[in-house]
């Protein structure tokens, strides 16, 4: 059985999402919905408590803003989890460099995801690095996966858990649990035959960068980590340097975007917009 653990922002699960799960999963399942509408839990606490209540042999941690398009995805997840004994997701990266990186900032992304970014629907299909002639492969070894959806055997959760002591928010739970698995000798796998649509893109806040600093401090001695690809020592060092530069500019850009969002919420901005466009109903 698959135990689907969801930390929700509403008191109850969205009926449309519940119906989507029921019509696509294709195996026995249960939904463990953690009501976090009052913000009583961070994601680490919520997922740990959900996993402790789970009855299934396969634990599935899921966002509440996704839609499944693959029929029988639950059976696929059960099979790959049983075969690998590790963490399974739909998109991730085959390298984590020696810096404060995220799966989506490192260079060797793998997997398929459809997501909504600023109102635009986009599908990213990342072929495995140096394996362009194997696009039909359905599983690929990785270092970390995105937290929008991932699974693991319940037996593995007895060895690793979401780190409530190091972190206190809603970021880095995915990359941290993956590093725990890797350090203990368990694989991380990306499956390319489960089609999921993600409806939010999120924002890079100060909390995100703070949590990522904690992640790097915890795992620095194990980095870099490479899985599923072969890289020379020189290539790894070049990638480390490139990743550090990319992280710097990502942080600077995020700070600027956060300031813009803050200004747009001020009374002065809204008043100025009204004075400049008194009859406009368009959002700026």
Which positions does each model-derived feature cover?
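A recurrent flexible, glycine/aromatic-enriched loop bordering the glycosyltransferase active site
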Residues: 118-152
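Glycine-rich, basic loop-to-helix element that forms the pyrophosphate-binding segment
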Residues: 38-54
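N-proximal low-complexity "stem/linker" segments adjacent to membrane-targeting elements
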Residues: 1-23, 32-33
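Boundary detector for helix-to-coil junctions that initiate low-complexity/charged tails
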Residues: 228-284
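Donor nucleotide-sugar recognition loop
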Residues: 143-145, 154, 158-179, 186-197
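Short aromatic/hydrophobic "clamp" motif used to bind/position activated sugar donors
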Residues: 59
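Conserved donor NDP-sugar-binding/catalytic core segment of glycosyltransferases
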Residues: 40, 67, 71-116
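Active-site donor/metal-binding and catalytic loop motifs
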Residues: 186-210, 214-218, 236
